[in-house]
Amino acid sequence: MKNVFLPLFSFFYILINCFAEENIVKSTISAMSPEEKAAQVLMMGIEGKKIFPSYLGDYFGPYAPGAFILFGYNFSDTPQASAAYIKSVKQSIQKLSKAEKFIPPFFASDFEGGRVYRIRKIASYLPAPKYVAENLSEDDALALYTHTAEQIALLGIHLNLAPIVEKGKTMGIGFLGDRLFSHDKDIILKYSKIFIEGMKNGGIISAVKHFPGNVNTDPHLSKSVIDVDEETFYKEFVDLFKEIIYDSDGVVLISHVEVPFIEKTPFCFSKKGIENILRDKLKFRGLIITDDMAMKALKEGGRSTSDNVISAISAGCDMVMCSEPRFRELITIISNKMKTDNSFEKRIDEAVFNILKMKMKMGIIDESCMPIEKNKFNEKKFYSAKEAAEKILKKNTN
């Protein structure tokens, strides 16, 4: 009899804890001002590489962005200095915050490998995805990504904006090149899963991108369109992502590509694409973030960054990435719309809920939504992980 009731008791215990945790998150959100909620849905770029620039105090003011995206210029020449910079940003934002309950930002960057690897000067080398898939065994690839993630995490970073889960021959995606694992679906799936598992082992969350895919037009430069029928769209684009994100609670980064048969608008603005396909058909329960709102693919027709941010959130994106210095402007635009549009306010609450749940998963806040103080940079652990990664690379180049 004991064996029958123990699993049942465990199930109800977990269920009760989940409900309690969700209620705490919801009560935390209800206590936030519209401006604080608006700040949470923004992933902003930031200047500096050594300490938090004092002149940014007035720019950020009393509000803490939900996240920061770091570029190559944000990393110093040593891991110690880079970790100190990230710590300085977090501490400075906390001092500036006037929130009753401070919610720390998470830090994200691109660590795909090869030409897209922001810490190449201070960490072990990470080859391009194509090289890894062609030259490393599954075990070596997993170990390499694990040890790379350990270094990334020790710097104070939480989210890797990778891997790219796309096929190179689909619509001739030439501009991505060796950033793709392969042209073969099975190899892409195998090494994408290895990448995500390795990052997780090392303490890093992965954002699979760029859902639902790309064509041979770089959205940084101009409008991009997937002009195919529904059957081809699912077979050549969505099915790859489905294998990775079905019933998942991770992170998905949305492309700016347009899919006309769904809606003649960038996918990040398409409620039919995000809600009907990603949420409903693929059962994705995690965090949805956009690519950079500053890309030229979104600027056509005279649209402003503010317009784009509102459109992306309204469509179902939880967090918008913006490398332009528009933090205060965007907070004002978002919070003003919340005050006059009940459905938009509800959408923001849903987005902030997903963000806070992800921050719990990242270990940034606890079940009570209180900040968790992480350990300081550990030089010994960093160089140990760096050495372990370099040994794997050396073995595979001899």
What are these regions, as identified by a protein language model?
Residues 1-4:
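Positively charged n-region of N-terminal signal peptides that target proteins for export
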Residues 7-17:
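Bacterial N-terminal signal peptides
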Residues 19-121, 389, 393-398:
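N-terminal hydrophobic targeting/anchoring segments and the immediately downstream early-domain regions
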Residues 21-62, 271, 281, 300-398:
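Preference for extracellular/luminal or secreted protein segments
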Residues 33, 59, 78-94, 98-101, ...:
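Second-shell residues forming the walls of enzyme active-site clefts
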Residues 39-46, 66-70, 105-111, 159-163, ...:
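Hydrophobic faces of well-ordered beta-strands that scaffold small-molecule active sites
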Residues 41-51, 130-142, 222-235, 296-302:
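Active-site mouth loops of central-metabolism enzymes
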Residues 121, 125, 129-130, 146-235, ...:
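Surface-exposed loop and adjacent secondary-structure segments within mature catalytic domains
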